[in-house]
UniProtKB/Swiss-Prot annotation:
<dbReference type="InterPro" id="IPR036925">
    <property type="entry name" value="TIF_IF2_dom3_sf"/>
</dbReference>
<feature type="region of interest" description="G2">
    <location>
        <begin position="491"/>
        <end position="495"/>
    </location>
</feature>
<dbReference type="GO" id="GO:0097216">
    <property type="term" value="F:guanosine tetraphosphate binding"/>
</dbReference>
<dbReference type="Pfam" id="PF03144">
    <property type="entry name" value="GTP_EFTU_D2"/>
</dbReference>
<feature type="compositionally biased region" description="Low complexity">
    <location>
        <begin position="246"/>
        <end position="284"/>
    </location>
</feature>
<dbReference type="InterPro" id="IPR000795">
    <property type="entry name" value="T_Tr_GTP-bd_dom"/>
</dbReference>
<feature type="compositionally biased region" description="Basic and acidic residues">
    <location>
        <begin position="232"/>
        <end position="241"/>
    </location>
</feature>
<dbReference type="InterPro" id="IPR000178">
    <property type="entry name" value="TF_IF2_bacterial-like"/>
</dbReference>
<dbReference type="GO" id="GO:0003743">
    <property type="term" value="F:translation initiation factor activity"/>
</dbReference>
<feature type="compositionally biased region" description="Basic and acidic residues">
    <location>
        <begin position="318"/>
        <end position="333"/>
    </location>
</feature>
<feature type="compositionally biased region" description="Polar residues">
    <location>
        <begin position="27"/>
        <end position="37"/>
    </location>
</feature>
<dbReference type="Pfam" id="PF08364">
    <property type="entry name" value="IF2_assoc"/>
</dbReference>
<protein>
    <recommendedName>
        <fullName>Translation initiation factor IF-2</fullName>
    </recommendedName>
</protein>
<keyword id="KW-0547">Nucleotide-binding</keyword>
<feature type="compositionally biased region" description="Low complexity">
    <location>
        <begin position="128"/>
        <end position="138"/>
    </location>
</feature>
<dbReference type="InterPro" id="IPR009000">
    <property type="entry name" value="Transl_B-barrel_sf"/>
</dbReference>
<feature type="region of interest" description="Disordered">
    <location>
        <begin position="1"/>
        <end position="374"/>
    </location>
</feature>
Length: 959
């Protein structure tokens, strides 16, 4: 089928008509118009074509309208004529390239399908002239009005994309073909390997079956020899008969699993179907068919068949049982025979329960053997549990309990026994005993010997000591070029600060100690951990009590002293007075003929600081300070606190060895793994050598200031030492409380006699040293009547648990340089618990002293008024006995306290109820006058008794 288009306008020649020139764009055709009654008429129709085009497609010229579409069969005949006209028609009829100027010379039919417009061809079929005339052929001479059938850019792009996609698909198909070939080769290799494995397994199975058949044949021969001869003859006669009903030569309905039957099995006599079937199950390792199994209802039928054979005169065949074949290790675990299990390479493996039972059986057999007793050296502490003793002896705790039961003691593995009982048990079981004390766990941690060849010089540790406000911290600030005083509350140091400075390329470690009287323990710790002590004395204040105390601490620690006479810039400074005052305390400076170095400095104006540092280096050079940096670290805890963000933080001074992150150390009763090391400038360091102060993070708890620490080998050792020290601390606390209170009877008597009152407190501070100083200061405030009772103290902020404890013990909460969190504040407000914050120890001690003074009972003071002698005693109705007296000394006041003295013995003390002169009540009666007196609730008065009158005053006391 060809479409008629006007792409090429040519002249057409009709042999029946004259030669005419067709108008461009107009096509004439003749059609037959039908009328009624079969009449027709030829009508000339002119078709004028219009060309419509859109921006995204090429303009096309519509074909002439036709009354009916052309037949499909006419397309192949008209194709040669219309091939040059339409590219789409040419592509539809043959896979030849269209005569267009396109980059691709060839294109398959599928990619060019979107270019053709079949709906145009269907709507505009080729016009057929009447009488079988063909359409006019194009005239190449006339080109007027012609429209070239060129491809638009979008169609060219579509064809180009189709070609590229076809090429991509071709590459992908080629790659898939290569992969498929590779996979097919691997599959063939795998199948060949499987066939080889199957053949090998089949050969092994055949060999095994042959061996089993041979063993079975030998067993049958032995059984046949043991059977009597008549039965054998009857059996041979019976072999001629066919097999009984229900016996099948082979299992037709059961799969054989691909196992070949053993060929060439030796037979006795003629072939016997029944024995073959009976032997098939043991050979193949699977149960017999249901038809061959003896069921409960089949025994009578078998007996009937045997009786029928006997009646017919034929000897009954005796039942021959197959010999029992002992299964091997593989057959025991084979189980049911199936196709899956038969085709698999390996049989069923032993289960975990079977393996466990086998191991337990082996262990029991080993335990039944008599083993040689091993004698061990058992280390026994002061107390030990039965379980721990059994582990150390490598014995069962059950055996120890049985032994104790024989001795009449019922005990459990967790019970604790003493060292003597443990020694008896160990010796009874044949072990030797080594008795140790609990304190032995600490042996060796501080006794590590230094390697003399590895000793190197270390920086000196210098402690700055002196009286409060003599300028210790200011001097250290001037040396460090920092300002620490402004950070201390009240301008006084309440912590131990450790720093390092560099002078002439050499490091010096400084420890600043508080000078307040409450911080005696801190100064003592600072003196013990130092090499050199700098005694700071103000030139305008001379020697003070804490100065003397610092001198005593330094002498007790055996460290040399360097005197720094500070504040020489003041007008009232008198350094010579300081030197003279030091002579009274056996401190002889060089200017006075001694060996103690003294330097006049001014921390405020930074005068002579270099001389002071040079004196320190000179003294350190004389001491020849050395340490081994390669050994495990040891040192002392200078300060400890509980930081909210970092946990327990301990400021330590390394004295020996080098400390690294990850080391396990014990500090007092606490232990932990070092998570980080922070120097005095807040920088994280990888290691801390000798004489270096650092902060340690990672301890399980907050140690006490002054505790020694040491690095141990493992966590078990550290935990053991820490538990021992905690237990020791608890025992000391109990002993201290029991010593202070005594027995219950003594405590009750003391309360009744003295009436000691307690002021409960919960103290929370920023560092452990401050808490220790506060506790010691409050202990000194106590008297026989009142004392401060520290319910709880610790480093860290105030929490809800502290408030709950204070509420239970009716205590007040004191926070020193710490604050309570919001939950604790809300809880304290609800429960009415008072929380007081302090940052200066002076104010804290003064307030606690005032509060404790309020608990003191007021002082009772008596003032003598006068004496009166009883002259006569009168009995008055409704009043009682009234004494008629004369005032002999002083005066007597109404409502005053009186004592009745008889024979110089006080027999009554009370109050005066009435005082009358004649019949009038009077306030007082002076000396020399007579009066009448009556006592409250007392009538035993006699003539001649003396009445002593006095006034009682209650005066409040203070501590």
């Amino acid at each position: 089928m060809s479409d008629k288009t006007n792409d090429d306008k040519t002249l057409s020649v009709n042999p029946k008509k004259t030669l005419t020139l067709k108008r461009p764009g107009v096509e004439q055709s003749t059609v037959r118009q039908n009328f009624s009654h079969g009449r027709t008429k030829a009508v000339v129709v002119e078709t004028k074509k219009r060309k419509f085009s859109r921006p995204d497609e090429k303009p096309e010229v519509e074909a002439a309208a036709a009354p009916k579409p052309a037949a499909p069969a006419a397309a192949p005949q008209q194709a040669p004529a219309s091939a040059p006209v339409s590219a789409s028609a040419a592509q539809a009829s043959a896979p030849q390239p269209a005569p267009v100027k396109a980059p691709a010379t060839k294109a398959p039919a599928a990619p060019s399908a979107p270019v053709t417009k079949p709906h145009v061809a269907q709507q505009r079929p080729v016009h057929q002239r009447p009488g079988g005339q063909q359409a006019q052929r194009p005239r190449p001479a006339d080109r007027s009005g012609m429209v070239l059938n060129t491809l638009s850019r979008s169609e060219m792009d579509a064809r180009r994309r189709a070609l590229e996609e076809a090429q991509i698909r071709e590459v992908e198909e080629r790659a898939r073909a290569v992969e498929e070939a590779k996979r097919r080769a691997e599959e063939d290799a795998r199948r060949a390997k499987e066939r080889e494995e199957s053949a090998r397994r089949q050969a092994e199975e055949e060999a095994r079956l042959k061996a089993e058949a041979e063993a079975r044949r030998k067993a049958e021969e032995e059984a046949a020899k043991r059977m009597p001869q008549p039965e054998a003859r009857s059996e041979r006669r019976d072999d001629a008969r066919p097999a009984p009903y229900g016996a099948r030569p082979q299992q037709a309905g059961r799969p054989q699993g691909g196992r070949p039957q053993p060929a060439g099995r030796p037979q006795q006599g003629s072939p016997r179907p029944a024995p073959i079937i009976a032997d098939a199950a043991p050979i193949a390792g699977k149960p017999l068919p249901q038809s061959q199994l003896r069921k409960p209802g089949q025994s009578d039928d078998d007996d009937d068949r045997r009786s029928d054979a006997a009646r017919r005169g034929v000897a009954a065949k005796p039942e021959v049982r197959a010999p029992k074949v002992v299964k091997g290790e593989d057959d025991r675990r084979r189980g049911k025979l199936t196709l899956t299990s038969n085709l698999e390479e390996e049989g069923r493996s032993r289960s975990l329960s079977a393996m466990r039972r086998r191991q337990e059986k082996f262990k029991r057999s080993q335990m039944q053997e008599t083993r040689e007793k091993i004698s061990r050296e058992v280390t026994i502490p002061e107390t030990i549990t039965l379980q721990e003793l059994a582990q150390r002896m490598a014995e069962r705790s059950v055996d120890i309990i049985k032994y104790l039961m024989k001795q009449g003691q019922m005990m459990k593995p967790g019970d604790v026994i003493d060292a003597d009982t443990a020694q008896l048990i160990a010796e009874e079981f044949g072990h030797t005993v080594k008795r140790v004390a609990e304190s032995d766990v600490e042996e060796g941690i501080f006794d590590v010997a230094d390697n003399e060849s590895a000793m190197v010089s270390r920086p000196p540790v210098v402690t700055i000591m002196g009286h409060v406000d003599h300028g210790k911290t200011s001097l250290l600030d001037a040396i460090r070029h920092a300002n620490v005083v402004s950070g201390e509350a009240g301008g006084i140091t309440q912590h131990i600060g450790a720093y390092q400075v560099v002078q002439n390329g050499q490091k010096i470690t400084f420890i600043d100690t508080p000078g307040h009287a409450a911080f005696t323990a801190m100064r003592a710790r600072g003196a013990q951990a130092t090499d050199i002590a700098i005694l700071v004395v103000a030139a305008d204040d001379s020697v003070m009590p804490q100065t003397i105390e610092s001198i005593n601490h330094a002498k007790a620690a055996g460290v040399p002293i360097i005197v720094a006479i500070n504040k020489i810039d003041k007008p009232a400074a008198d350094p010579q007075k300081v030197r003279t005052a030091l002579l009274q305390h056996e401190v002889f400076v060089e200017s006075m003929g001694g060996e103690v170095l003294d330097v006049e400095v001014s921390a405020k104006n930074k005068i002579n600081l270099d001389k002071l540092l040079d004196a320190v280096l000179l003294q350190a050079e004389m001491l020849d300070l050395k340490a081994d940096p390669d050994r495990t670290a040891e040192g002392v805890v200078i300060e400890a606190q509980l930081d909210r963000g970092r946990g327990s933080v301990a400021t330590v001074l390394i004295q020996k060895g080098t400390l690294h992150p990850g080391d396990i150390l014990v500090a007092g009763s606490e232990w932990g793994r070092v998570r980080a090391l922070v120097n005095d400038r807040g920088e994280h360091v990888k290691e801390a050598g000798p004489a270096m102060p650092v902060e340690i993070l990672g301890l399980q708890g907050t140690p006490q200031a002054g505790d020694r620490f040491a690095v141990v080998a493992n966590e078990a050792k550290a935990r053991e030492i820490a538990e021992y020290r905690q237990r020791l601390a608890r025992d000391k606390a109990v002993a201290r409380q029991s010593g202070a209170r005594g027995s219950l009877e003594q405590m009750m008597n003391q309360l009744q006699v003295s009436g000691t009152k307690e002021f409960p407190l919960v103290i929370k501070g920023d560092v452990q040293g401050s808490i220790e100083a506060i506790t010691n200061a409050l202990d000194k405030l106590g008297t026989d009547e009142v004392r401060a009772r520290i319910v709880h103290s610790g480093a860290g902020g105030i929490t809800e648990s502290d408030v709950s404890l204070a509420e239970a013990s009716n205590a007040a909460i004191i926070g020193f340089n710490v604050r309570a969190n919001k939950q604790a504040r809300d809880s304290a407000e609800q429960q009415g618990i008072e929380i007081r914050y302090y940052n200066i120890i002076y104010d804290l001690i003064d307030d606690v002293k005032a509060a404790m003074s309020g608990l003191l009972s007021p002082e009772r003071r008596e003032t003598f008024l006068g004496n009166a002698e009883i002259l006569e005693v009168f009995n008055i109705t409704k009043v009682g006995k009234v004494a008629g007296c004369r005032v002999t000394e002083g005066k007597v006041e109404r409502g005053a306290g009186v004592r009745l003295i008889r024979d110089n013995v006080v027999i009554h003390e009370g109050k005066l109820k009435t005082l009358k002169r004649f019949k009038d009540e009077v306030a007082e009666v002076p000396s020399g006058q007579e009066c009448g007196m009556a006592f409250e609730n007392y009538d035993d008065i006699r003539a001649g008794d003396v009445i002593e009158a006095f006034r009682v005053e209650h005066v409040s006391r203070t501590l």
